[in-house]
UniProtKB/Swiss-Prot annotation:
PROSITE patterns: F_BAR, SH3. Pfam families: FCH, SH3_1, SH3_9. SMART domains: FCH, SH3. The lineage of its organism: Eukaryota, Fungi, Dikarya, Ascomycota, Saccharomycotina. The modification Phosphoserine is found at residues 327, 463, 472, 476. Residues 493-555, 577-633 form the SH3 domain. The gene is BZZ1. Residues 429-495 are annotated as: Disordered. Residues 138-210 form a coiled coil. One of its GO terms (biological process) is actin filament organization. This is Protein BZZ1. It comes from Saccharomyces cerevisiae (strain ATCC 204508 / S288c). Keywords: Coiled coil, Cytoplasm, Cytoskeleton, Endocytosis, Phosphoprotein, Repeat, SH3 domain. One of its GO terms (molecular function) is enzyme activator activity. Plays a role in endocytosis and trafficking to the vacuole. Functions with type I myosins to restore polarity of the actin cytoskeleton after NaCl stress. InterPro entries: AH/BAR_dom_sf, F_BAR, FCH_dom, SH3-like_dom_sf, SH3_domain.
Length: 633
């Protein structure tokens, strides 16, 4: 079957619609099961009762064709178009209506080899569907819990601000040592609450992204696999029902061969394709959470660390997060390896759709579900720890020591985390920073911090449709490798110098490759895009590099011979995403200069997807322009 088709990639945040669609298809099995049981009885009475039964199920098919094909709430009405499975079912009913008589053996065969198997198929698929639904509910509950934690942190912060304001008023009225001490204590408590609130904002945003770009698509693809497994099993049973009728004679055999030819065209991917086509919708990602100052204590989004007291609290949090992260790293890597292997097996099955084995496919689906559920939970926990580490390390001033070597976690109250890394388009680091320390980015130039409120838009790596020729072990695994989260302590001899912190390999033409040890000079500072233009004095190249991979001293200026307007900020790097293509199934002649002509069989590279207008922007034979989305698959 087609490995490129993925409901999770194409239809965002559509669990309810997809789950209902799969439920309709599983309930449909009961209709088909009942059909064969009734058919077994009617075979004894020959053609008259058999013809009546066929008519009855023609009517049932007519009423369920739309929800089975495109779901209950399609965004585009299908008209007279039916799913391949429904078309195959229609052909079977037509051929059944032409059979005028039968005998007891055929009745027995229908009862034992078809109806009972359909009943068993419904039971096991329904159990799997329930398990997937539980998996989804668990993810939703975890997301909601994290949102609730954010609300609680906000409430605690507001209360701390109010208490601080009251203490300040008392001190203003009576400026004595006792009130001064109370004021300092309340200010420290307020700062702690603020830091916790900022951490929860980070975690909520990252969890939100992970949920919509990784977790939900994973569940949708599992639902897709259940429905496709249903199609595979159903095809086998239909073919079995046809084979027992072949023994009745040449005429019956001839009619059933016609039905078989349609059933064999019922590719699981065709049923998925028509559902996707008629349920595409304009979906907008929910907005990021942002810091909201207390109404009684106006402040900004920066961490509050005016003294070592707040730092000590953050060091404890950092130690706990590092401990959690390290304990979960091996688990997630082992689970990811298993998922990659299963994904490769599933991909190979789907690329050979004509010869796929339903049992093997379903067994792979079940095994994948058993692994992905704990993997997702562990990865979410790891993300919480990772975000907490990043939030603390990137926001504490350099003069404070964040070393956690002397922190005994056994003497502190343990708190469980609920976060893991999610799928985003951060560029891979080819060489990790040294682990010589974790006190900051250096004692020299300013610490470059990626603002909590200026994060670039993330995308779910490996989830876009792949070209047919691609074969990646990690195809559709919604995760990314996590870079070492500890910052590197720089030698004091490097103070005031520009420096390469981490290695980076060029991905686009306007970028350059850098390696720790290279001498660099500033050309244009970061304008907020996360990219800085530099000159690599070692290699002589000039281009963009990630701002967080280098350190530019506060005294650095743009080279005189390179002065001029700041270069245009390049778009977010997406070079790790596979190219998406579409195949033309109908001819179209361009009607304007902004369109391109296509012929059946043309492979078109998608540059910009359909925005809901019915048109896609792509490139074919070197020409770029718009073409009708519905003319391609």
């Amino acid at each position: 079957m087609s490995a490129d088709l993925s409901i999770g990639n194409e239809i965002k945040d559509s669990f309810k619609e997809t789950h209902k669609w799969v439920q309709n298809n599983l309930k449909w099995l009961k209709d088909i099961e009942q059909f064969y049981r009734e058919r077994a009885k009617l075979e004894k009475d020959y053609s008259e009762r058999l013809s009546r039964l066929s008519a009855e199920y023609f009517n049932k098919k007519s009423s369920t064709s739309v929800p089975i094909s495109v779901g209950d709430t399609p965004t585009t009405t299908p008209g007279s178009i039916e799913a391949a499975g429904v078309v195959a079912w229609n052909e079977i009913l037509s051929q059944t209506d032409m059979i005028s008589k039968d005998h007891d053996q055929l009745s027995t065969d229908f009862e034992n080899h078809v109806a009972n198997q359909l009943s068993g198929l419904f039971t096991k698929l329904d159990m799997t569907l329930s398990k997937i639904n539980g998996f989804n509910n668990d993810m939703v509950n975890k997301k909601d819990n994290i949102y609730h934690e954010l609300e609680k942190a906000k409430k605690d912060y507001d209360e701390a601000c109010s208490t601080m304001e009251m203490a300040r008023n008392r001190y203003t009225k009576a400026s004595n040592d006792r009130n001064k001490k109370k004021l300092d204590e309340k200010e420290m408590e307020m700062n702690k609450c603020k830091n916790e609130y900022l951490i929860k904002i980070n975690q909520a945003n990252r969890t939100k992204d992970k949920y919509y770009f990784q977790d939900v698509p994973e569940v949708l693809d599992l639902l897709q696999d259940v429905n496709e497994a249903k199609t595979l099993f159903l095809n086998d049973l239909w073919l079995k029902a046809a084979s027992v009728e072949n023994d009745l004679g040449a005429n019956v055999s001839k009619r059933l061969q016609a039905a078989n030819s349609v059933v064999k065209q019922n590719k699981p991917s065709l049923n998925t394709a028509i559902f996707i086509k008629h349920n595409l919708k304009n979906w907008k990602e929910p907005q990021d959470f942002v810091y909201k100052p207390s109404p009684v204590w106006h402040d900004d989004e920066k961490f509050a660390v005016p003294s070592s007291l707040e730092v000590e609290d953050l060091r404890i949090k950092l130690a706990k997060a590092e401990n959690d992260y390290n304990s979960l790293q091996d688990k997630t890597q082992n689970e990811l390896s298993k998922l990659s292997t299963l994904n490769k097996i599933k991909h190979e099955m789907k690329t050979n759709e004509d010869n796929i084995n339903a049992t093997k496919f379903y067994d792979t689906l079940k095994e994948y579900l058993n692994v992905v559920s704990p993997f997702t939970s562990h990865e979410t926990l790891k993300l919480q720890a990772e975000v907490q580490i990043e939030s603390i390390q990137n926001n504490v001033p350099e003069e404070y020591d964040l070393s956690t070597d002397n922190i005994d976690l056994s003497k502190t109250k343990k708190k469980s985390g609920i976060f893991s890394k999610f799928k985003h388009n951060i560029l891979n680091v080819d060489s990790k920073p040294s682990s010589g320390g974790s006190t900051g980015n250096g004692n020299g130039g300013p610490l470059h911090i990626t603002s909590l409120f200026n994060t670039s838009r993330r995308t779910r790596l490996g989830s876009a449709p792949n070209n047919a020729g691609e074969d990646s072990d990690n195809n559709s695994i919604r995760t990314t490798s996590t870079n070492n989260t500890k910052k590197t302590t720089q030698n004091s001899s490097d103070d005031g110098k520009n420096k390469v912190l981490y290695a980076y390999v060029q991905k686009d033409d306007d970028e350059i490759t850098i390696t720790p040890g290279d001498k660099i000079s500033l050309v244009a500072r970061d304008t907020g895009s996360g990219w800085t233009k530099i000159n690599n004095d070692t290699t002589g190249e000039t281009g963009l590099v990630p701002t967080t991979y280098i350190r530019i001293s506060s005294a650095a200026t743009v080279k005189a011979n390179d002065r001029g307007p700041a270069p245009e900020v390049p778009p977010p790097r997406r070079s790790t995403l596979p190219v998406r293509t579409m195949e033309a199934i109908y001819a179209y002649e361009a009607q304007g200069d902004d369109e391109i002509s296509i012929d059946p069989g043309d492979i078109i590279t998608v540059i910009r997807g359909d925005d809901g207008s019915g048109w896609t922007y792509g490139e074919c034979d070197g020409l770029k322009g718009l073409f009708p989305t519905s003319y391609c698959k």
